[in-house]
Amino acid sequence: MTHTTTIAAIATPVGRGGVGIIRLSGPKAYAIACALTGKESFTPRLASFCRFYDANNNVLDEGLVLYFKAPHSFTGEDVIELQGHGGMILQNQLLARVFELGAHQAQAGEFSYRAFDNDKLDLLQAEAIADAIDATSAAAASSAIRSLTGAFSNKINEVLEALIELRLYVEASIDFPDEEDVDFLSDGVIEGKLQRIQQQLTTILSTAQQGQLLRDGVHVVLAGRPNAGKSSLLNSLAGQERAIVTDVAGTTRDTLQETIVLNGLTIHLTDTAGLRDTTDAVERIGIERARTAINQADLLLLVYDLSQEVDPLKLASELFGEGIDGTPNFDPSKLLLIGNKRDLVEDKGESANKLADKADILGYEQVNVSCETSQGIPQLIASLCDKVGFHPPENSLIARTRHLDALRRTQQHVDEAHQQLVIYQAGELVAESLRQGQYSLGEITGEFSADDLLGRIFGSFCIGK
């Protein structure tokens, strides 16, 4: 699509820096660069050292000009990059002059949107740009770059082509039932192709689920009675003294958040106030916030003191209520029992696992640790990753919630097509289910996308990208 306006924005982070970059894209970009510098021409892809002048021919700054001639640019339009000195005063003065010469302020993600609009990249690749910038771990950054280079798109397009081909095959079977060279619905060919597509979707969905964990991380909450060692555990996992630790019960009175990376997984860790009955107004507010955090957690680490011979399941029942079967009213898949102060128990020659068997039998996993000696911490990290299903493949791909939603809807439509074929031999319904599956899968790369979806996606980008 041809855009009639020329957009500009500062492309480097706000603040002091050695270099500040202003990016322009659009039909006037080249002319603006010439007017700004007094030069008559620029050679594409060759850096030119220039001075930048205001309307009165005063020097605003000096630096490099890079010219990317359409369509051989990021956006597919004429693109100019002005590389001057960093610092907001110089950058804002230079940008204001660019606006005087006819450019408009770029909106969030507008450069990437134009690249998408001009078929320089698909929606998956555009999102991967933002995900690479926002990555909180090396694994997430690497996965985003793989998606940016088209690895994820290639997998989606392969299945999309198979869906289109199969849909055409089914429609041909309906339209030409008497042709000898066209197979019918009952010959097994269509079912075989459907099964292969189902297998491909299952594999891609599994990879995408790992990619979503890489991108978003998980929200993990530490909870338990006062003085159980929650804050000490947060410090152990964070590798630094983030929470105040004392022998006084109730030291933590509010939630404390820390983002850490363990085994490649980003964990948004929240320490909470100890759960108990209290008349202290401030502590009660902290406990209310703790329960709110617990309800929103992807995983709860229920910390208890091994030296106090606490039954963790009884503790969980006291804190969260008891089900009709006598077990805690809390989903075992979202709960990890953490026996702390293991060193104190073992120093006495006692076993730290005396209650573990009971918990395991009932489906509640227990890990015993010592924040003092770091015993059990590696096992806790491994159990945490396993609990949330984090097992990324070597060549993982970044993914978002909308990708998973689209993949699941595609799976549902393909499963429906298989059912219509095997049970009812209903060719028209098979073709319709395949059409819906094709549409759902195409949403991922942007082949089929509503304008409001595109607005939400590109609106979340930073200015200048």
UniProtKB/Swiss-Prot annotation:
Q: Where does GTP bind?
A: 227-232, 246-252, 271-274
Location(s) in or outside the cell: Cytoplasm
Q: How is the cofactor bound?
A: Binds 1 potassium ion per subunit.
EC primary class: hydrolase
A Gene Ontology annotation in the biological process aspect, one of them, is: tRNA methylation
Q: What's the cofactor? A: K(+)
Residue sites binding (6S)-5-formyl-5,6,7,8-tetrahydrofolate per the record: R23, E81, K120, K465
List the GO terms this entry assigns under cellular component, sorted alphabetically: cytosol
Residues that coordinate or bind K(+): N227, T246, V248, T251
Q: Which UniProt keywords apply?
A: Cytoplasm, GTP-binding, Hydrolase, Magnesium, Metal-binding, Nucleotide-binding, Potassium, tRNA processing
GO molecular function terms attached to this record: GTP binding; GTPase activity; metal ion binding
* InterPro entries tied to this protein: G_TrmE, GTP-bd, GTP-bd_TrmE_N, GTPase_MnmE, MnmE_dom2, MnmE_helical, P-loop_NTPase, Small_GTP-bd
Q: List the cysteine pairs that form cystine.
A: none
UniProt keyword annotation of Cell inner membrane present? no
State a single Pfam family of this protein.
Answer: MnmE_helical
Assembly and partners? Answer: Homodimer. Heterotetramer of two MnmE and two MnmG subunits.
Stated family: Belongs to the TRAFAC class TrmE-Era-EngA-EngB-Septin-like GTPase superfamily. TrmE GTPase family.
The record's PANTHER family line, in alphabetical order, gives: TRNA MODIFICATION GTPASE GTPBP3, TRNA MODIFICATION GTPASE GTPBP3, MITOCHONDRIAL
This chain's function reads:
Exhibits a very high intrinsic GTPase hydrolysis rate. Involved in the addition of a carboxymethylaminomethyl (cmnm) group at the wobble position (U34) of certain tRNAs, forming tRNA-cmnm(5)s(2)U34.
Query: What HAMAP family does the record point to?
Result: GTPase_MnmE
Per its record, how is this protein called by name? tRNA modification GTPase MnmE
Gene for this chain: mnmE
